[in-house]
Amino acid sequence: MDTILETDKLSKRFGDFEAVSGLNLRVRKGSICAFLGQNGAGKTTTLRMLLGMMRPSQGSGHILGLRIDDEAESVRIRERVAFVAEDKRLYDYMTVRQILRFTKSFFPGWRTDRESDLLRRLDLPLGCKIRKLSKGMRTKLALLLAFARGSEFFILDEPTEGLDPVATEMVLQIVVSLASDGATVFFSSHQIAEVEQIADHILMIHKGKLVLDSPLERIKDEYRQVQAVIHCPVQNCDFELDGVERVYVDGSTVSMIVSHNVDAVMDRAYKMNAVSVEVAPLTLKEIFLETVKASG
């Protein structure tokens, strides 16, 4: 399986605080990979290290075969990777038309056809000064400047922030079309529903550590809530099984979050004379919240 991004024990410390701890990330070529985590989990710090904008304290990484911790190679990474930062910084004194002309001059592979299509779909005013654009319009412009570069790899930090629902849906469709054309997209987001709609792989970090790394379909197929009603003393029940992530007890009811091995968990419940055992799927949001809780 070809990878476009990989890291080995990537870490970043700020004094005594370890913001990112030993990350081993892999992003497959042609995938849409979501990078999830709470505020302060280390997502933006990780993205900055990947792009050579911040040096790691330990560990290493490669994008497109180039070392992220080598100054010269990190410049080449930034030339080849289309990046949209969370703050969407742009040259406020320029008009939309001027920044388009300015940006395309740096990229020989600029997709003029995609630029024209996105200008129409995103309804950007060419003659307007950037400083007069709304937050949503600035986000649209930043995305257009990235999407039209003709890159094979896109790194997007909160790409739909500030967009209304119609514009959000349009941007998600564009991201899917990029992947359909052979590009790879690695994006961070707080919008779980959006992630569930377009991502095919999930990388989740919590307090700087990788806590989940799996294809989305496998997560949705295997994660379950198992609820058993057991009339024997619940405190004597042993559900320390492979795949049981969390156990909640409420009277005679035992609820478990199970990442895999559901059949074995059900068998254990029946061996404890459970009078009923129910299995229900979990949404990605529920899995995210439970993974965060389990990680402490």
Label the model's feature ranges.
Residues 37-42:
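Walker A (P-loop) phosphate-binding loop of ABC-type ATPase nucleotide-binding domains
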Residues 154-158, 163:
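Catalytic Walker B motif of ABC-type/P-loop ATPase nucleotide-binding domains
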Residues 79, 85-142:
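ABC-family P-loop ATPase nucleotide-binding domains
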Residues 51:
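Helix-to-loop junction immediately C-terminal to a conserved catalytic motif
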